[in-house]
A protein has these predicted regions:
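Cyclic nucleotide-binding regulatory domains
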Residues: 50-108
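Polybasic "coupling" helices that flank or enter modular domains
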Residues: 131-197
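Cyclic nucleotide-binding regulatory module and flanking cytosolic helices
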Residues: 1-51, 57-60, 91-92, 97
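Phosphate-/nucleic-acid-contacting segments
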Residues: 173-250
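ATP/adenylate-binding site constellation spanning eukaryotic-like Ser/Thr protein kinases
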Residues: 66, 88, 109, 160, ...
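Cyclic-nucleotide recognition modules
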Residues: 84-149
Length: 250
């Protein structure tokens, strides 16, 4: 039987996931308790830049309790392309050959916890329908939508549009977590990392951020960024509604 200290630790580790799930659909006390019971093992701490150990042989999943994680590819000449970001509350999974050529690493100091039981319970075919499973289904749909957005960003948008759209997407995600207030955005990403996400050179990234600042849309600082004009950024992103709403949920 778990003692009070263990239960308190689990609640802190799973709090971002609980908040995010509840932003998609009510999960209730029963759903919250199931989330907390679904995680096992000691939390793992990795410093910024470290690889996140995953075991694809057993489709291991991990919950991001704190910090930011990148998934992407490293080219032979040292260039990187980041294809996805995992924030607190996200669950990452090693899916064998699908991710064989991708790296997963910490962009900041991170804490993760084994989420394999949670992933198996809710993601397997025939999983019991419940308020929690519905929230998880919507969460996974949003994740797939983010991947589609990234493809459109890299394939069809210019640097200005890409940057505006990425910042809006990160703001939307943080509103769901309750960590964004107004236009204030937690952004622990350097310009080099932003360039790796958006497929730009460091020089082009810097010029684009300066242009957004001159247009009084974004005040960028590593660690904390202010989105000064959300409707203006939506217009600058120049994406149709087919790629999903970028106005944060209430």
């Amino acid at each position: 039987m778990k003692n009070q200290s263990d239960a308190g630790l689990e609640a802190r580790l799973t709090a971002p996931l609980e908040i995010m799930l509840a932003s998609f659909a009510p999960i209730g006390i029963e759903g919250r308790d199931l989330v907390r019971r679904s995680f096992s093992g000691a939390p793992q701490h990795q410093p910024s830049g470290a690889a996140i150990p995953m075991d694809p042989e057993r489709n291991q999943a991990r919950l991001v309790a704190s910090g930011w994680i990148a998934r992407g590819a490293m080219l032979n000449d040292g260039r990187r392309q980041i294809i996805g970001l995992s924030l607190p509350g996200d669950v990452i999974v090693a899916s064998g050959s699908v991710d064989a050529d991708l790296l997963v690493w910490a962009l900041t100091d991170v804490v993760t916890v084994d989420a394999t039981a949670f992933w198996t319970t809710l993601s397997e075919p025939g999983a019991q329908v419940s308020p929690l499973s519905e929230a998880w289904r919507r969460c996974r749909t949003a994740e797939r939508l983010r991947m589609a957005r990234q493809v459109v960003r890299l394939g069809r948008l210019n640097a200005y549009e890409r940057t505006a759209h990425l910042l809006l997407e990160l703001h939307e995600r943080q509103v769901r977590l309750g960590t964004a207030r107004g236009g204030a955005l937690h952004l622990p990403l350097t310009q080099d990392v932003l360039a790796d996400i958006l497929g730009l050179s460091a020089v082009h990234m810097n010029r684009t951020l300066q242009q957004l600042r001159r247009n009084v849309l974004v005040d960028y600082r590593t660690g904390r960024t202010l989105l000064q004009d959300l409707p203006g950024l939506v217009q600058a992103a120049n994406l149709s509604a087919v790629c999903g709403p970028l106005i944060p949920p209430p």
